[in-house]
């Protein structure tokens, strides 16, 4: 059978080790001490969450250990007995340590067989102390040096720091440090589990793009329900013959993760998705994303992003999301793989002497008012006879609307200037 051994103390993974099912557990422990930096007095073995006692006289099969299973080495609190045992082991010089290991191999055929692959002549070596010391001594001594240099505490930190922490574990600073170490162990365990059971979460996810047409020009549109507005870049507006329809009165600044310059707005254009023509409006933003289909158009046409079928349903039609190979290259994304759409849009009119910045981060829930009603209403106060601050009326008029339109919008929104501005721009 093949076993994999992970050592939580030094963070190493060993294996797969080729072993026999009738191998005794104590023989496995001896092998792990040589090959996997396991110290029986200071560390513990775990299989399926249960501790394996090294002194149990059972075979691996009897313990339920099978092919491709995992053995975990974990540290344990240092006791006075273990310190005494480790001290006596360190007192052995290198030659005595090598000879002790040779004698152990002589009396343990299973352990000797496990070393047959790296040392084909292991039988002759163990019977000749001098040859064993010459050929295997350097390897055994190197392993011993590595084990002695490794931290012996369960957190894998320098032993001096561990002893300092454990002298007064209730000290607030010590308690904070111990909690950090425990959290790190938990994070490392979660990472190992994620790599083993859900490795797909570490793969890059393709963003959602669809094919559409603007004035007969094929375009790949990025679908982003997290973006507030639908955006088109100046170069794509020029390519699709929309540049002459850009309303320059709506220049401003878009603020999100970064900032972008708004060059204007295209109020209405017919875009084609599959066989369906859909009215759409664009904010012209100097961005690396040529076309971004934002929440305004998705909500307007009652779109549904169906990830199970990998399609976008919008305005009675259905179109497939593009595969990774079809997605435009060179699009700007942030560190977590998301684009940087504007979150707040501030618009102003060029001809105004005093620009009013209007935030569209809140969508007003007001009853739509027909343009005919706005234009034909002769009463400057509306039907309610309410009056509004002259300063508010002037600010909204500076955006390019008549006094009657402004007052009617304020009446419809109960005097809320931001909602009134949003209503006027519809």
Swiss-Prot record:
Coiled coil: none
Positions of the Ubiquitin-like domain: 1-80
Swiss-Prot/TrEMBL GO biological process terms: positive regulation of DNA replication; protein secretion; protein transport to vacuole involved in ubiquitin-dependent protein catabolic process via the multivesicular body sorting pathway
Any Gene Ontology CC annotation: plasma membrane
CDD domains: RP_DDI (cd05479), UBA_scDdi1_like (cd14309), Ubl_Ddi1_like (cd01796)
Active site, UniProt feature: 224
One of the record's GO molecular function terms: ubiquitin binding
EC number: 3.4.23.-
SMART domains per UniProt: UBA
Enzyme class, UniProt record, top EC level: hydrolase
Subcellular location: Cytoplasm
Pfam families assigned: Asp_protease, UBA
Keywords, sorted A to Z: Aspartyl protease, Cytoplasm, Hydrolase, Protease, Protein transport, Transport
Record-annotated UBA domain positions: 387-426
Family membership noted in the UniProt record: Belongs to the DDI1 family.
Subunit structure: Binds ubiquitin and polyubiquitinated proteins.
Function: Probable aspartic protease. May be involved in the regulation of exocytosis. Acts as a linker between the 19S proteasome and polyubiquitinated proteins via UBA domain interactions with ubiquitin for their subsequent degradation. Required for S-phase checkpoint control.
Record's protein name: DNA damage-inducible protein 1
The encoding gene: DDI1
């Amino acid at each position: 059978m093949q076993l994999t051994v992970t050592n939580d103390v030094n963070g190493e993974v060993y294996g797969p080790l080729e072993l026999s099912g009738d191998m005794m557990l104590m023989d496995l422990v001896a092998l792990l001490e040589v090959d996997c930096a396991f110290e029986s007095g200071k560390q513990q073995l775990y299989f399926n969450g249960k501790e394996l006692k090294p002194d149990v006289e059972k075979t691996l099969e009897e313990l339920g250990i099978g092919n491709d299973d995992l053995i975990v080495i974990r540290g344990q609190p240092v006791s006075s007995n273990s310190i005494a045992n480790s001290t006596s082991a360190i007192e052995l010089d290198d030659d005595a340590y090598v000879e002790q290991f040779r004698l152990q191999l002589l009396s343990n055929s299973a352990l000797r067989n496990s070393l047959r692959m790296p040392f084909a002549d292991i039988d002759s070596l163990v019977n000749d102390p001098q040859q064993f010391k010459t050929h295997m001594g350097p390897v055994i001594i190197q392993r011993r040096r590595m084990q002695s240099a490794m931290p012996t505490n369960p957190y894998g930190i320098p032993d001096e720091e561990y002893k300092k922490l454990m002298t007064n574990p209730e000290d607030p600073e010590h308690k904070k440090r111990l909690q950090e170490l425990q959290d790190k162990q938990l994070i490392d365990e979660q990472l190992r589990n994620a790599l083993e059971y859900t490795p797909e979460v570490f793969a890059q996810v393709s963003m959602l793009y669809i094919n559409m047409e603007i004035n007969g020009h094929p375009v790949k549109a990025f679908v982003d329900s997290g973006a507030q507005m639908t955006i088109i870049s100046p170069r794509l507006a020029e390519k699709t013959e929309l540049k002459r329809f850009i309303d320059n009165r709506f220049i401003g600044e878009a603020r999100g993760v970064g900032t972008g310059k708004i060059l204007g707005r295209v109020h209405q254009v017919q875009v084609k998705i599959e066989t369906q023509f859909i009215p759409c409006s664009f904010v012209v933003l100097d961005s690396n994303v040529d076309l971004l289909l934002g929440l305004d158009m998705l909500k307007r046409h009652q779109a549904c992003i169906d990830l199970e079928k990998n399609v976008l349903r919008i305005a009675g039609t259905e179109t497939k999301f593009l595969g990774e190979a079809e997605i435009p290259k060179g699009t700007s994304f942030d560190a977590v793989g998301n684009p940087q759409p504007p979150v707040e849009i501030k618009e102003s009119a060029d001809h105004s002497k005093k620009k009013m910045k209007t935030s569209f981060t809140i969508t007003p829930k007001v009853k739509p008012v027909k343009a005919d009603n706005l234009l034909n209403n002769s009463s400057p106060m509306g039907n309610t006879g309410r009056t509004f601050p002259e300063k508010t009326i002037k600010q909204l008029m500076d955006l390019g609307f008549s006094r009657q339109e402004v007052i009617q919008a304020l009446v419809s929104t109960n005097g809320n200037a931001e909602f009134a501005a949003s209503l006027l721009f519809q």
